[in-house]
Regions:
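WD40-repeat beta-propeller superdomains and closely related acidic/aromatic-rich repeat-like regions
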Residues: 1-323
Length: 323
């Protein structure tokens, strides 16, 4: 199934029914069945699935956080004059987090009156809930700050490493936290003792991260193929080498998506192509062979049955994986 939207595709995800939902740079949310919602007066800057699995949560340059379902949009929060450019949600706790500049905000889907705000020294670039949804990681300059999402007055835990951290991801067991940096490298920590893990060797910036296979592997962009780090055991990737899958000299992987419980990864390339791979046998399955504008959004269904993608020129699609 192919689409030709009129704007850049900011994000794509699968809802609880297994249907793709696209967030666009013109402020609209598009559903696989053709439904469209005008969610924002401006561009969507970040979007994730709602904790309920129904529809999409999006932050925009209009300062609004919006929950879009096929029936229409619902405003969750508003920060007039600001850009909401990082959003996270936890199905486990029902909490929603979003940031604008140095301010991080938390809301509760079960309690409309609940509100928390946390200040940072520098701009927050990305957010991620730990698996239980109680702690929240905020990637910023100098490291990642950790907050207990429900506690009002607190000092954050700080995982420190010099440089600008632009994306972050928790391992499914909550033992490790990995960040992408402005440099051509990742940095990770074993959270319990703050043990540092340097993960370098990338030819470009690895901006896209995805744990898969029950947390035993971490897939990243930033190279000519998908870079896969081993995370099994108590020490994660420490002292181990990464593998590279689907290497092509003429293209770079810019987006990755992983099936949480299965060894399947999807890759979006800077030349517009998309493929998926079963890492147990390293069999690459082409999903979009036509070249075009760079892939900007990518998602794989939890059962690894389908992949959805979007590109910077508005081209998008959904494909079945021939397993």
């Amino acid at each position: 199934m192919q689409y030709a939207f009129d704007a850049y595709v900011t994000a794509v995800s699968f809802d609880a029914a297994g249907k793709a939902v696209f967030a666009l740079g013109d402020g609209s949310v598009r559903f696989e069945d053709g439904a469209a919602v005008e969610a924002h007066d401006g561009a969507i800057l970040a979007a994730v699935p709602h904790p309920s699995g129904q529809g999409l949560l999006s932050g925009g340059d209009d300062g609004r956080l919006v929950w879009s379902q096929a029936a229409g949009p619902k405003d969750i929060a508003a920060l007039p004059g600001k850009w909401i450019d990082a959003v996270a949600a936890s199905p486990a706790s029902g909490l929603i987090a979003f940031s604008a500049g140095r301010e991080l905000h938390v809301r509760d889907t079960a309690d409309a009156a609940f509100s928390r705000s946390f200040a940072h020294d520098r701009t927050v670039a990305d957010l991620a809930f730990e698996p239980k949804g109680r702690r929240l990681a905020a990637a910023t300059y100098g490291g990642v700050w950790l907050w207990y999402a429900r506690i009002e007055a607190q000092k954050p835990g700080k995982l420190v490493w010099a440089g600008s951290h632009v994306a972050c991801a928790w391992s499914p067991d909550g033992k490790f936290l990995v960040s992408a940096m402005q440099e051509n490298q990742l940095h990770g920590w074993r959270v319990a003792d703050e043990k540092n893990m340097r993960m370098g060797g990338y030819p470009t910036k690895p901006k896209s991260l995805a744990f898969l296979s029950k947390g035993n592997m971490l897939a990243t962009s930033g190279a000519n193929g998908v870079v896969v780090w081993p995370f099994a055991g108590a020490t994660g990737p420490m002292g181990k080498q990464a593998a590279e899958v689907g290497y092509e000299e003429a293209a770079m992987v810019v987006k990755v998506a992983g099936a949480p419980a299965l060894p399947w990864v999807a890759a979006g390339l800077d030349d517009g192509r998309v493929w998926a791979c079963d890492l147990t046998g390293q069999r690459v399955v082409p999903l979009k062979a036509e070249k075009g504008a760079s892939v900007t959004a990518l998602a794989i269904a939890p059962d690894a049955g389908r992949v959805a993608w979007g590109c910077e020129d508005g081209a998008a699609g959904v494909a079945e994986i021939d397993r």
